[in-house]
Amino acid sequence: MKKFLVCLLAVLTVGLFAQELPWQQNFDNALRLSKESGKPVFAFFTGSDWCGWCIRLDREILSKQEMKKYLCDNFILFKADFPQKNPPPENIMMKNHELMQKYGVRGFPTIVITDASGKALGMTGYMRGGPDAMMKVLDKYVKKASPK
């Protein structure tokens, strides 16, 4: 019985750490959720299957448990992915390209933080220092977005 409980706990723990982030694929939906929650939008522009820096950002920062918790607690997450394999439907790709133009995204990875109206509060990308460095930068935007 003791072994069973230890195994069960191990399986549940692995499942918790493997949890995916709740990315929105529709920016309008992300803005609606932002209005409802009061959280700013974390818009991640990426080439998930071909961009080396995007893959590195995901592996070194976004996939870390403390970063996942921070992002979920403080942001509505939107991902504009431009993969080479298995691209999203044409209408989503068109919208993502429009958003790139709107926010002046010129390369990947780019993170744009917006308020609930879609106004850009700031922009960043890959940075050294892991989750702590990223959270320090993002904290400034969370404070900007919070009502006074």
Regions found by a protein language model. Name each.
Residues 51-55, 111:
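The canonical Cys-X-X-Cys-His
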Residues 37-51:
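Short active-site neighborhood of thiol/selenol oxidoreductases, capturing the structured segment around
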Residues 23-41, 71:
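A short beta-strand-turn-helix
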Residues 4-14:
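Sec-dependent N-terminal signal peptides
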Residues 21-24, 67-94:
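Thiol-based oxidoreductase modules, predominantly thioredoxin-like and allied folds used
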Residues 98-147:
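Non-catalytic, surface beta->alpha helical segment in thiol-disulfide oxidoreductase systems
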Residues 54-70:
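Typically the conserved alpha-helix immediately C-terminal to a functionally engaged Cys/Sec
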Residues 14-20:
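Sec/Tat signal peptide C-region and signal peptidase I cleavage site
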